[in-house]
Amino acid sequence: MDQKRLTHLRQLEAESIHIIREVAAEFANPVMLYSIGKDSSVMLHLARKAFYPGTLPFPLLHVDTGWKFREMYAFRDRTANAYGCELLVHKNPEGVAMGINPFVHGSAKHTDIMKTEGLKQALNKYGFDAAFGGARRDEEKSRAKERIYSFRDRFHRWDPKNQRPELWRNYNGQINKGESIRVFPLSNWTEQDIWQYIWLENIDIVPLYLAAERPVLERDGMLMMVDDDRIDLQPGEVIKKRMVRFRTLGCWPLTGAVESHAQTLPEIIEEMLVSTTSERQGRMIDRDQAGSMELKKRQGYF
């Protein structure tokens, strides 16, 4: 890796660590949202660096839909145990009682009830006043215009027309009781930055990011990996083994794989350099309707 690229990554690292420390010092009860993906892994690594050799001064929170890949659950538990992190797991009890699932109820309702409402329940339950998230501005257009300190009202709603100015490195964390701030320390990172930093720092990631032969079927222009026996096969669908990997991770029925032979980090980085598509091309929740991500965020999504 050339010196300019290394310096660039260290600048991003320093900015993120500064933000994480600012939140820990400014807020009474922060939490780090942990979705188990590559961005969460980088964010957790940065947080551990920020407070080394001490432990994290806040817990990790995983909002569980019950539909993550099995490898993600195993990785989550292994990571929390290895680093001695306090891990909180919340699953929307009303959604569980209703039997909400992406095959029967669709991606929009599943996401709203199991993710958005589940997150708001957890934030209210524990009284968190700040929540770290791993979103980046290069991922999606609504995230591109969101501040690093993203103000949320007492209903956890985001108003893109009422954002606070962020001049230089001055962040406004002033809130009233019941309000909160979502904090995005990776805002200025790109997907390429994330992968190069993972390689540079030797950060452990879910194996699903690396190409391997996996059982998939084609549905709605997406390669769906069949992760358990809850699959609802439609007429004419056939499960086949194909060489695939994932650029982004979520609920397995709503996350499409991409055909790839990149089995190492350098091969993933090389693949990213020539890619012309968004990493979120395989996320079904982004296809619900025009501007669906912004609408979800207005309602309290990550």
Curated annotation (Swiss-Prot):
The protein depicted here goes by the name: Sulfate adenylyltransferase subunit 2
| Superkingdom per UniProt | Bacteria
SUPFAM superfamilies xref list: Adenine nucleotide alpha hydrolases-like (SSF52402)
EC class name: transferase
* Complexes and interactors: Heterodimer composed of CysD, the smaller subunit, and CysN.
Matching entries from CDD domains are given as: Sulfate_adenylyltransferase_2
| Catalysed reactions, semicolon-separated | sulfate + ATP + H(+) = adenosine 5'-phosphosulfate + diphosphate
E.C. numbers:
2.7.7.4
Family designation: Belongs to the PAPS reductase family. CysD subfamily.
Function noted in UniProt = With CysN forms the ATP sulfurylase (ATPS) that catalyzes the adenylation of sulfate producing adenosine 5'-phosphosulfate (APS) and diphosphate, the first enzymatic step in sulfur assimilation pathway. APS synthesis involves the formation of a high-energy phosphoric-sulfuric acid anhydride bond driven by GTP hydrolysis by CysN coupled to ATP hydrolysis by CysD.
> Does this entry carry the keyword 4Fe-4S?
no
Q: Which NCBIfam families does this one have?
A: CysD, PRK05253.1, PRK12563.1
**What are the entry keywords?**
ATP-binding, Nucleotide-binding, Nucleotidyltransferase, Transferase
Q: Does the keyword Nucleus apply?
A: no
HAMAP family, from UniProt?
Answer: Sulf_adenylyltr_sub2
